[in-house]
Amino acid sequence: MKLRNLTLAVSLVLAGTTALTTAAYAQAKEQFVPVLSYRTGPYAPNGAPWANGYVDYLKLVNARGGINGLKLTFEECETGYDTARSVECYERLKSKGASFVQPLSTGATFAITEKAPVDKVPVVTIGYGRSESADGSVFKWNFPIAGTYWVAADAILQAIGKKEGGLDKLKGKKLALIYHDSPFGKEPIPLLQERAKMLGFELQMLPVTAPGVEQKATWLQVRQAKPDYVVLWGWGVMNSTAIKEAQATGYAREKMYGVWWAGAEPDVKDVADGAKGYNAVAMQHGAEPQSKLVKDMLSMVHGKGLGTGPKDEVGQVLYMRGAMSAMLGVEGIRAAQERFGKGKIMSGEQIRWGLENLNLTQAKLDALGFAGVMRPISTSCNDHMGSAWARIHTWDGKTWKFTSDWLQADEQVIKPLVKSTAAKYAAEKKLTPRTPADCQS
């Protein structure tokens, strides 16, 4: 046991991953957080900085004294952004007392969603996953906190509407959706189809086979159709390829809007000035090099030799996304402790309650180092999302800069879509929506 604890301490110092057996976990009195990540494969340039931010935040929590004194331990498992491998990682790590799981893959989210109610492990999907899981009355164990892809798609349409002088001006316009041909890429389609009917714009859908390095045929269609705007729903190398093809075909980057997974430094750095003017939606955060969180990361984690990745990526878009994702999971544990016992290890069921009762006021977020980075988030039994706000940031050739005010997705459009889709899921799975009594559990 002493050797195992020594190994754990050394691995933390070396910024490696930590691993505890179930017995060691119980004796150590630490809260175990599984980390599903992908540092290899075609999506590694995007997956690695997210994982670095995620793991660094867990280390920062420990450096700050833990959660009411309770320290965190974690173990990474490499998924390669593969659904089957993600499920394997989930199965292996859940036995170690998993607090929650963040799959970082919509395909994996769909698969793990079926397992979570039995395993009693919350599925936390920060700004991704299945959009209808915002309905907590049906999806008791899913938490798409801080927004879904329907929120992102609606925010993009609102930004385009503002540019045109109002959403009504979209009537008769052409909008092309270039999307990753996967569950992730298909997520915005129901919202965009609904909005197309409401607003009268033409929606052209152009799937791209993963990983997305071949798009010449796609951009030939764009050149022929001449859409007024292109929405890019990509991930990994697909994004930089799309921007390069837009440049080659002469399509204005100013008329391109990416999902937030198509709006980070790896997506544009190889194109640089060629990507200038390209826009992407930002679900809460963007690049935040001046934030207090980044200053704390640099002094308390990297400054102590505990940094997981390169120091110069701290504060970049995907690093911040990983840190924000970890923070929201940690705050679920903290909220659970408020009810079930401060400083105690929380079970998956208790953390599920905490995630369902988050009340992250601006004061709380500011104290955590997220001042100017995030808006308040408040979840409930029926609302597992907690926020429907986003912004647009634009690449200026060197950095990402915010170019819009906060945009609130139209929940009069989104909520009925969430309800109807969740109800369909409940009917297919023969689920009974939760009762008020269940909401108190």
Label the model's feature ranges.
Residues 93-106, 122-126, 174-179, 226-236, ...:
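Periplasmic-binding protein-like
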